[in-house]
Amino acid sequence: MPRTSKAAGSVALVTGANRGIGLGFVAELAARGARKIYAGVRDPGDVSDQFKELPVEVVPLDVTDRALVQAAAAGCPDVNLLVNNAGLFTNHRLVLTDDPDAARREMEVNYFGVLNMTRAFAPVLGANGGGYIANVLSVAGAFPAPFMGGYSPAKAAALFLSSITRSELAEQGTEVIALIVGSVDTRMAAHVQGRKEDPRDIARAGLTALDRGEYVADTDFMAIEARARYARDPVRYERGMIKLLKATVMDTGR
């Protein structure tokens, strides 16, 4: 970690902050000396002692509700570090699905939610010297993931959003990083098999990459390995996905 982290003395807002990666970011920001952390949560009643002894102020926030997002921006005028972490994964396929609205819900949270927050807080960040935006994305958005129906396209859209935001906000001095996350030990990924990373480690890797001035950063071993494997031979990867999908249909009937 650089001698002085960009998180030190910062005023941060983290969406989806009461569990998983979001909670990991809250803890890591506090450890790096953040002055204040706004914890954006959909239901403040869902908060118990997660933030005990941390410099946290809970903010009611649903990233799909533009009125709430604007209220958060108005009520948090000192933010200079925004962590867009809130996410939704429904575990449905994109085309052959029994829930045709699942993909729309995933796009609303994982793409439009990030866009809503970025639009609302861009003026706040600009007024506070430029600041930083960290978008918590997924390896499923770095290449097509057929097992993650609407989630994969939504995260891919958010990856492009990150790049465009970086260009648009460059003049006001806002730095933007896209964090490519693999498999993490969270409630949202409870169904995923295999090795999973600790959410705090993801936050630590993400903030370290922000300190280094990176634009896009893999936060864990799975993200690094999967992206490299796809880059080596995307056709072979896609054929492998087709075989796995066929096996899944035979095993589950879906």
Name each model-derived stretch.
Residues A178-L179, T186, A190-R232:
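C-terminal helical subdomain
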Residues P144-S152, I164:
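Active-site loop-to-helix junction immediately N-terminal to the catalytic Tyr of the SDR YXXXK motif
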